[in-house]
Design a protein with these regions (language model features):
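Extended, domain-scale alpha-helical bundle/helix-rich regions
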Residues: 279-282, 288-295
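ATP-dependent carboxylate activation and anion-phosphoryl transfer catalytic cores
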Residues: 1-274, 279-283, 303-305, 316, ...
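Conserved anion/nucleotide-ligand pocket segment
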Residues: 507-514
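Conserved A3 ("GATE") glycine/threonine-rich loop of ANL adenylate-forming enzymes
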Residues: 470-473, 515-520
Length: 870
């Protein structure tokens, strides 16, 4: 039955074997029913239920859990009609789910820990509340704050993807914001997602042709559509009719708009203390206030404008307080280390010492494509080392899915924003020994210069050296001075300059706007038309926003160096090679370590160049350099003065914890250089990427310079074929039983695939091939059956029909180049393979390696060994 427009409510219930039952947390979706819970903004505790409605659903949840007889933790989801108080149970999860992780972070009640103990036969009354250490676990947490969970989508990375939200989950991460009122929590949350938004108001204008349609059909930008509609004068009732979002939430959002309008009527000189305080209480940042009172136009620099408001605010004595999450709504005296920062309070719940013996680690924020659990691993390892060295550890992060936001990982956890303003608030309160910015990916790295200007002690590599590596022009001139090669590039500010540059170096070229993580908005263009079209789409070329164009070298190996240095001298390093050629983003590539096919001379040169770079940049701590090698020519692509996403992988293969070593160096603890023999391994590790194309309807599953994987696996084997086979099976590829469909792109790729095709034939596989590939295989004496492209209508056999009839076990489809025409033809075959769950490989190097692996290694040959046995 369709219940569109009803509310979606969830309860988390815990029951022990003595039949004691409590509800730990109830949550409410901001969006009405019809959108997957993982795609909705979720608020805890529920805000719009009346007392009787709340208790009615609570008693039902307990009844359900008792009836099923669950011992442990259970999650009950309802659809609820506020008009008639009618309800339906949508589902019951008798396991720890995504909602339970949120519930335990939101309440501070350790659900998984309690559920495990209950499973062992303990009663609720026998367990201690591990947050407060003084009360038992047999109580229902009370919250004196509001928590708001917002999903993060990365839909713009995929060609042709469907942006509408529904019952299939497409988000890749989430954030959790804590505030004293709904307005504060939602504004914090919208900033935390990290997509360039500053809250509910004062963002870049969205271009929306049809507002009514955009309100009716939920997409990943719906909240900002509501903001625009309210600015345009839509009433709460009009928006409610279109979106079915509860009027209570809409009235709160309207309140934010009202404060914004009031600010817009002032300038910096007429801004009074009362209005400034009110704006801060309801979640406005100094940045939003500066923009609203028109400082942006005067200063021409938003950071400067924000500092002016910060100074004014401190002059008025408006500073935030630190509150703790103690599961008891402060009704019982308890000390916890789980904290958030707010302006809606009088005094802080915790005291601060001035001994400068604490170290702050900045976390990695929301999981997204390009920055995921790898950086969280780095942050947690750093916290462990800091504690072992006798410092107090402080973590700032806001992602409820991470280990770093567990309250027992560090001495103090600030569950709050990683913006300059908030980090400075916390530094002002804590006066730490130093701050670590190199273990959280790009977000902390971008803050380094701003923090340094405020004289914040940054541990490890100095901020100006970080800037020298991040700023392409400075980094490039340093390479040139030291005689180190790099792909020819130029930062250009007009179309004429771009044309001149391209005429000089020739196609293909790599085009990218400056300062990005995970290759967002990068593209390889192989002719004039593509170049013009891409520049119109992705970047408005101007004086302030130059576009970097560099020569792209085809068929070059990509090699990475992950290392740790002390005072510019390399202490430990790991050189790994990509199986795919350069042109596939390093986060999507399949990586082998130690490298299997590099010339000794190449490795020697890479070590030499890395030593030079480390010395020039005075590196202290972790860094990563990416190289391109063709024959023995070695070019530097980029250098990051922070831990990279391959750090956990190389640390585990080498059994040497790079982050532990780096943290000791940053703290100034003397370390010994690891033994040389450590770096000679007699086994191979392979890191493969996990893709989620089946969830992203209509997206083209092809790999390019823009990162699109959502996870990864690491496997060890006695040789590279065994390790590769394990890792491909781990990411859900299957070994084909009988038939393989080949369509292998340009002449170079066809030649690369020839040996693999012969091998398939020798091992009894039947080959199907499309037009050009079929002709090429036949010329080389390889039997195959010709199949037709979707564009050859009326001819048979059609590739798509064979796929639908389940006659194909694996598809190797390699686009000649990434032009739209070429992509569209192969797109239908690639998309059909994904939708019909047929293994698909779109890279010739990876396809050859995988085919070689499954032809030469049988499943019986694979040993199962523990990590320690290698």
């Amino acid at each position: 039955k369709s219940l569109k427009g009803w509310k979606e409510i969830e309860y988390e219930v815990v029951r022990d074997r003595y039949d004691n039952c409590i509800t730990v947390c109830n949550m409410e979706n901001f969006d009405p029913l019809g959108i997957h819970t993982g795609e909705s903004i979720v608020i805890a505790p529920s805000q719009t239920l009346t007392n009787s409605e709340y208790h009615k659903l609570r008693e039902l949840s307990i009844k359900i859990v008792r009836h099923i007889g669950i011992v442990g933790e259970c999650n009950v989801q309802y659809a609820f009609d506020p008009q008639s108080e009618d309800y339906r149970v949508i589902e019951v999860n008798a396991r720890l789910s995504r909602s339970s992780a949120l519930a335990s972070k939101a309440t501070g009640y350790p659900l998984a820990f309690v559920a495990a103990k209950l499973g062992m036969g303990y009663g609720l009354f026998e367990l201690k509340n591990s947050v407060t250490k003084t009360t038992s676990a047999f109580f229902e947490p009370a919250l004196d704050y509001v928590v708001c969970k917002i999903p993060r989508w990365d839909l713009s990375k995929f060609r042709g993807v469907d942006k509408e939200l529904g019952s299939s989950m497409k988000s890749v991460g989430e954030v959790m914001a804590i505030g004293r009122n709904f307005e504060e929590a939602i504004q914090k949350g919208l900033r935390m997602i990290g997509q360039g938004m500053h809250g509910f108001v004062e963002n870049k204008e969205l271009q929306i042709p049809d507002l009514d349609a955009a309100l009716r059909e939920p997409t990943d930008k719906r909240v900002f559509v509501i903001s625009k509609a309210m600015h345009k004068g839509y009433t709460v009732d009009q928006i409610h009719d279109l979106t079915k979002i509860d009027r209570w939430f809409l009235n709160k959002l309207k309140h934010i708009i009202d404060i914004d309008e009031a600010l817009k009527r002032r300038n910096i000189n007429t801004l009074d203390k009362e209005l400034l305080r009110e704006a801060k209480v309801y979640g406005f940042t100094d940045f939003q206030i500066a923009r609203a009172v028109g400082l942006e136009g005067e200063e021409q620099n938003m950071h400067k404008a924000m500092l002016i408001v910060r100074q004014l605010r401190k002059g008025f004595g408006i500073v935030p307080v630190v509150k703790q999450i103690d599961t008891l709504a402060a009704e019982y005296p308890a000390q916890t280390n789980y904290l958030y920062v707010t302006y809606a309070g009088v005094a802080s719940d915790v005291s601060f010492s001035n001994d400068r013996n604490s170290v702050i680690v900045l976390g990695s924020g929301a999981y997204r494509i390009g920055s995921s659990v790898e950086f969280d691993w780095c942050g947690v390892q750093a916290l462990n080392t800091i504690r072992k060295q006798g410092y107090r550890s402080i973590m700032i992060n806001y992602n409820p899915e991470t280990v770093s936001t567990d309250y027992d990982m560090c001495d103090r956890l600030y569950f709050d924003e990683l913006t300059f303003e908030r980090v400075m608030d916390i530094i002002d309160a804590e006066t730490p020994h130093g701050v670590i910015v190199s273990t959280g990916g790009q977000i902390p790295n971008n803050l380094a210069m701003y923090l340094d200007e405020q004289n914040v002690p940054i541990l490890g590599t100095a901020a100006k050296d970080i800037d020298n590596a991040e700023d392409r022009a400075k980094f490039s001139s340093m390479l040139t001075e030291n005689g180190i090669n790099q792909p020819e590039w130029s930062a250009l500010t007009s179309m004429d300059d771009i044309d001149k540059f391209v005429d000089r170096v020739g196609f293909p070229v790599l085009v990218r706007p400056s300062y990005v993580l995970s290759g967002a908005a990068m593209n390889i263009c192989s002719n004039k038309d593509e170049l013009t079209r891409f520049l119109q789409l992705a970047a408005n070329v101007s004086e302030d926003h130059p576009v970097v164009v560099s020569k792209f070298i085809e068929h070059a190996k990509e090699i990475e160096m992950d290392a740790v240095a002390q005072n510019g001298e390399i202490m430990a390093y790991a050189i790994s090679e990509h199986i795919e050629f350069a042109g596939v983003h390093s986060g999507d590539a399949t990586i082998q370590f130690p490298p299997q096919k590099l010339y000794v001379e190449t490795v020697r040169r890479i070590k030499r160049i890395s030593r030079q770079i480390a010395k020039q940049l005075h590196i202290n701590g972790p860094f990563n350099i990416q190289y391109m090698a063709r024959d023995n020519d070695i070019l530097v692509i980029e250098c990051n003065l922070r831990a990279s996403r391959s750090f956990p992988f190389v640390s585990k293969v080498l059994k040497l914890n790079f982050i532990d070593l780096a943290t000791k160096i940053m703290l100034g603890v003397p370390v010994e250089k690891p033994n040389k023999n450590l770096f000679d391994l007699d086994y191979v590790g392979i890191k493969a990427s996990q893709f989620s194309f089946n969830r992203l309807q209509k997206a083209d599953p092809v790999l390019g310079v823009d990162m699109s994987s959502t996870g990864e696996v690491g496997c060890l084997g006695d040789d590279s074929s065994t390790a590769l086979l394990k890792s491909m099976l781990s990411v859900g590829q299957r070994i084909p039983k009988k038939t393989v469909l080949l369509s292998t792109g340009g002449a170079k790729q066809k030649a690369e695939m020839l040996d693999a095709a012969k091998m398939l034939l020798q091992h009894g596989y039947e080959l199907y091939a499309t037009g050009g590939t079929s002709k090429y295989l036949t010329e080389n004496g390889i039997e195959n059956t010709l199949v037709y492209w979707p564009s050859d209508e009326g001819k048979a056999p059609q590739a798509l029909d064979l796929l639908h009839e389940k006659k194909i076990d694996m598809v190797v489809n390699i686009p000649k180049d990434l032009t739209p025409r070429e992509l569209t033809n192969g797109y239908k075959i690639r998309r059909a393979a994904i939708d019909l769950n047929v293994p698909l490989i779109t890279n010739s190097r990876l396809a050859s390696a995988f085919i070689t692996a499954f032809c030469n290694v049988s499943m019986d040959d694979i040993d199962i060994k523990a990590w320690g046995e290698y």
